[in-house]
């Protein structure tokens, strides 16, 4: 509940209806950026939502935030390499989600120091269809194996582009482009919002496997069960259709 002291300085803009909307979306694992970008453009900034949470104006705690952000001054330690294609080179149709077959990729890791086991995650941008595969570690070789598995499972028509961050596991991009003919575009550093679909989907998967989980011990059955549930949830951004239904529709249009 909201404290009495918080109510004293409650912003006039924060109506009960607005508070209920924000609290509901936060409980659904949305980030403040996603809430503003989807439903509150021009109403307030996402920084305002963070402020309201920290100051106790909303009936949620900071635990509801999926990502707390990096501390100022921290340096990226995941390995550096030269990229060829950046997100600025990506076709506009990918940005607008106009066409089917464009994917965002990421890696979900186990708790630091606990295990090298991790998951390669893939999201089709137009349908939000979500795939995750177990990897032994966060290396370029393991990521290439995961991408190869996705390529062998789906047809090349369903894999037109990949958008990734600058993690060391994606140093396999030249091998991917050479062997599979799939261009790989790199997001800007510290710009997770440029891969918002994947960030959001990873947050949904974390509901099943919290950050302290040793992902090496997650069984294939449990992973599959979680993916089925996620892909069969109706999404507002899809007109309350499910990612699974939208993905099937996209495949049918290509056949």
Label each residue range with its predicted role:
Residues 1-25, 38:
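Short, basic alpha-helical/linker "hinge" immediately adjacent to a nucleic-acid-recognition surface
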Residues 1, 44-97:
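Basic, flexible linker segments flanking DNA-binding modules
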Residues 157-170, 190:
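Acidic/histidine-rich, metal-coordinating catalytic segments
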Residues 111, 115, 132-156:
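Active-site beta-loop-alpha junctions of metal-dependent nucleic acid enzymes
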Residues 108, 114-131:
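Short conserved beta-strand segments at catalytic cores or DNA/RNA-binding microdomains
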Residues 100-111:
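Two-metal-ion RNase H-like nuclease active-site motif
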Residues 22, 35, 49, 106, ...:
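Mobile genetic element proteins and their domesticated derivatives, centered on retroelements
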Residues 16-20, 24-28, 177-184, 188-255:
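Charged alpha-helix within mobile-element recombinases
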């Amino acid at each position: 509940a909201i404290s009495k002291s918080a109510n004293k300085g409650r912003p006039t803009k924060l109506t009960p209806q607005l508070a209920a909307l924000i609290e509901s979306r936060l409980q659904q694992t949305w980030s403040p950026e996603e809430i503003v970008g989807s439903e509150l453009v021009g109403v307030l900034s996402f920084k305002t939502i963070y402020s309201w949470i920290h100051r106790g104006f909303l009936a949620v705690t900071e635990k509801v935030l999926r990502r707390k952000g990096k501390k100022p001054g921290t340096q990226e330690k995941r390995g550096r390499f030269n990229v060829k294609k950046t997100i600025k080179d990506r076709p506009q149709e990918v940005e607008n989600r106009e066409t089917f077959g464009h994917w965002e990729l990421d890696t979900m890791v186990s708790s630091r120091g606990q295990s090298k086991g991790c998951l390669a995650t893939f999201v089709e941008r137009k349908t939000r269809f979500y795939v995750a595969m177990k990897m032994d570690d966060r290396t370029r070789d393991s990521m290439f194996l995961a991408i190869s598995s996705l390529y062998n499972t789906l047809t090349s028509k369903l894999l037109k582009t990949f958008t990734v961050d600058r993690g060391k596991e994606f140093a396999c991009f030249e091998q991917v482009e050479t062997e599979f003919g799939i261009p790989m575009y790199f997001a800007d550093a510290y710009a997770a919002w440029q891969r918002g679909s994947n960030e959001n989907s990873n947050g949904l998967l974390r509901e099943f496997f919290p950050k302290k989980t040793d992902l090496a011990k997650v069984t294939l059955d449990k992973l599959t069960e979680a993916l089925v549930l996620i892909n069969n949830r109706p999404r507002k951004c899809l007109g309350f259709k499910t990612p699974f239904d939208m993905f099937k529709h996209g495949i049918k249009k290509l056949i």
